[in-house]
Amino acid sequence: MKAYETAERRDLAEAVDGSNIHGWLQNRIHDSEGRLADLVTTLTATGTVRFADLKEVACNFGKAAVTEVPVTAPEAFHLLDDTLLNGMPCDQVMKVVESTPDTVIWEETQDLHGEFWNGKSDCYYKLRSALIKGLLSGSTFKLKSLGGRQYEISK
């Protein structure tokens, strides 16, 4: 079995450890993050897929995932927050520092993704940016990096 494959095939009700739901979920998140990083690095390192093609796939996935186009910046932010995997809710990774109908600014309090990418976490963030571009493509909002771990969604 390759590192990006999973052997878990049971129904969710059977797979969840009811006595330690938080720990079980945390393990699944780490498993998912690791498998994504392994898949992307394996495909691009072997030349099977170009990274630009993966960004296009991520963008198209984002476009297809939208069920309701956000009309306010807080709605756009919640679309991202509901779609992206940023740890457990208790981790409070995406901390809003400003919110108006036209703008949301937030900071990511920690980098939960970098550890899985063997020094190439920029790959994850480029794929995430492409996904977000797709998610916001039908709206009037754009994502802007403000430097560090601060981001802005605005018109």
PLM region spans:
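N-terminal accessory segment detector
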Residues: M1-S99
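Sequence-level detector for tyrosine residue identity
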Residues: Y4, H22, Y124-Y125, Y151
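Short, hydrophobic/π-rich interface segment
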Residues: P101-L146
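Beta-rich nucleic-acid/ligand-interaction surfaces
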Residues: S145-K155
